[in-house]
Amino acid sequence: MGGGRGLLGRETLGPGGGCSGEGPLCYWPPPGSPPAPSLRASLPLEPPRCPLRSCSLPRSACLCSRNSAPGSCCRPWASLWSEPPPSPSSQPAPPMYIWTLSCAPAASWAPVTHWTDHPLPPLPSPLLPTRLPDDYIILPTDLRCHSHRHPSHPTDRLLLLVIWTHLGGIWAGHSPWTVIQTAGRPPRDLSPSARPISSPPPETSCVLA
């Protein structure tokens, strides 16, 4: 499995095409590549998979990455949303690219979807898009992934949606989602249960609570 750490769409490319901490930076997707299919268009595709034995999380909370081995502890994309996808006659979802945070060799992480210069995508309720500035990210409270760079860069103003498969954490009166600002420290009004990373390094940092 790759042990590289994503840097907001940039990865270091090691021998054999894997991620490593050394080597020149490469950009993914490559310049000029066609846009990835929308989330709604990808719903009928085979759901992502992650390893059963090497996953450090409970089966119900197993998150998937592109580096994962064959297995089946992940749910179809359609089950990640609390509401059914809109009908095909409605406005299509904005183009998107799917990235992966590979923060530790022994763990599998959820894909991170970047939207740039597009309207806010449909979000799982009870989130309200009007409350989400374009420099905030949405995180499940059971997983802290804080994307951060010094100094801040205009490309950091992305809406990052971490797709969370651990739907068992949703119950009445509780929202599993946490909003964290991508530049600087998280706002002080986060709930105590969020326990955000207070001083992230100038790279993607992931910690399990």
UniProtKB/Swiss-Prot annotation:
Region (Disordered): 182-209
Membrane topology, from the record: Lipid-anchor
Tissue: Ubiquitous.
Keyword Lipoprotein applies: yes
Keyword match Lipid biosynthesis: no
Subcellular compartments: Cell membrane
Signal peptide: none
Principal place of residence: membrane
InterPro entries referenced in this protein's UniProt entry, alphabetically: CAAX_1
Modified residues (Cysteine methyl ester): 206
A Pfam family it matches: CAAX_1
Lipidation (S-farnesyl cysteine): 206
Superkingdom in the source lineage: Eukaryota
UniProt keyword list: Cell membrane, Lipoprotein, Membrane, Methylation, Prenylation
Name this protein carries in UniProt: CAAX box protein 1
Propeptide: 207-209
GO cellular component entries: plasma membrane
Disulfide bonds: none
